[in-house]
Amino acid sequence: MVAVKEATNVGKITQVIGPVIDAQFPSGKLPRIYNALKVQGRNSAGNEVAVTCEVQQLLGDNQVRAVAMSSTDGLVRGMDVVDTGAPISVPVGTGTLGRIFNVLGEPVDNKGPVPAGETFPIHRPAPKLVDLETKPQVFETGIKVIDLLTPYRQGGKIGLFGGAGVGKTVIMMELINNIAIQHGGVSVFGGVGERTREGNDLYNEMIESNVINADKPEESKIALVYGQMNEPPGARMRVGLTALTMAEYFRDVNKQDVLLFIDNIFRFVQAGSEVSALLGRMPSAVGYQPTLGTDVGDLQERITSTKEGSITSIQAVYVPADDLTDPAPATTFAHLDGTTVLSRGLAAKGIYPAVDPLDSTSTMLQPSIVGSEHYDTAREVQSTLQRYKELQDIIAILGLDELSEEDRLTVDRARKIERFLSQPFFVAEVFTGAPGKYVSLADTIKGFKAILAGELDDLPEQAFYLVGDIEEAKAKGAKLKEG
């Protein structure tokens, strides 16, 4: 959404280099950095051209260099460039819910214009230090494995690692559903440089699972902002900021708790790297932009808790060639409060959500924050699962009978814990037929303490699979014994 105030400040294109253009303006009328420019004119076929660009550099000699937010096909030297006098601004508020937008805040779902309302510029300062909520607070998700072993921080940033088909999208949708029902919050999804098909699938799955109400979009729980792989690097570089700006409105004006999903944070860095060389910057390590730390920091520092509300961010992280020392993921890790790692092995066993209880981490899992009961239970669960992992080779070669009585008990409890970490999801009801369960943190701790204490050693392990709290497991166990 780029409003042209008055066509008073008009320049001319002097050079087009792929997605980057140079434009010359009258003396004393140079646009500011980050101002939106609108290229107007007709291409060689006589068709109207309307391309929005963002000023990145002032070159001297009354020239600026700008990055295009859409294809520069058809642009030629001498075309008019209008300075809009302001940065790219996007619609915000409840009118954005249930809709799909591009980087400029224009709806791309063929459902007509967004109801007229407020707009915010995508470049905004991070909240002031005095406005921040510095007391660490756990963000309860209702998902047992996350709340117990990798608790999320309210206003924190979590990296979501996982390959294709292990359930990233389903976990995202469940979190969106739970924050809407339990916290009265909303979500914003930023699709940064991912496949168009995935964006389309996500939208359709959200309609199926009632996260989006196609008939009454205002009753939806999420706004979607897409800048896919086929978009120019300028759009992929800025679409994350568009999504973040929409989330900031819900936090600062509506005073809500917001979930911001960014899929994929690596593509944001990659787009910046593509543009950097065209802007004439000297590349740094592995060919990345020299401003890598600043680019990531500018985005991440705006994602935080204030005294009014919070933005909790879940960011899918692609690790190039599985190299965690690559500058892009390494820079991202510095900002994360926790990591949720999805395991293909668990998914193959049918244990969903397939969160790896030993690989996933959280800075919140400290006795001073979550309390000693939660901390001790989580650590005991992890040590039991770790011991089970160590014993698996012996079991595979010699069988269970060769284990000591104590180890056999550990294996038995670990298998129950593994199954109890699974849970039926609300958004998967239409596929599984099992009603979804939201499990409070207190019930989660109570359940795992009972398993660890040996109170449920007599129940079959199948009783713990895909249930909510421990009472449900007991009831299922009693039914299995009867049957």
Swiss-Prot record:
Membrane topology per record: Peripheral membrane protein
S-S bridge residues: none
Cell location: Cellular thylakoid membrane
Enzyme class: translocase
InterPro entries linked: AAA+_ATPase, ATP-synt_VA_C, ATP_synth_F1_bsu, ATPase_a/bsu_AS, ATPase_alpha/beta_chains, ATPase_F1/V1/A1_a/bsu_N, ATPase_F1/V1/A1_a/bsu_N_sf, ATPase_F1/V1/A1_a/bsu_nucl-bd
A cellular component term, taken from the record's GO annotations: proton-transporting ATP synthase complex
Catalytic activity entry: ATP + H2O + 4 H(+)(in) = ADP + phosphate + 5 H(+)(out)
Keyword Thylakoid: yes
Record key words, sorted: ATP synthesis, ATP-binding, CF(1), Hydrogen ion transport, Ion transport, Membrane, Nucleotide-binding, Thylakoid, Translocase, Transport
Subunit structure: F-type ATPases have 2 components, CF(1) - the catalytic core - and CF(0) - the membrane proton channel. CF(1) has five subunits: alpha(3), beta(3), gamma(1), delta(1), epsilon(1). CF(0) has four main subunits: a(1), b(1), b'(1) and c(9-12).
HAMAP family linked: ATP_synth_beta_bact
Name of protein: ATP synthase subunit beta
Organism: Synechocystis sp. (strain ATCC 27184 / PCC 6803 / Kazusa)
Encoding gene (name): atpD
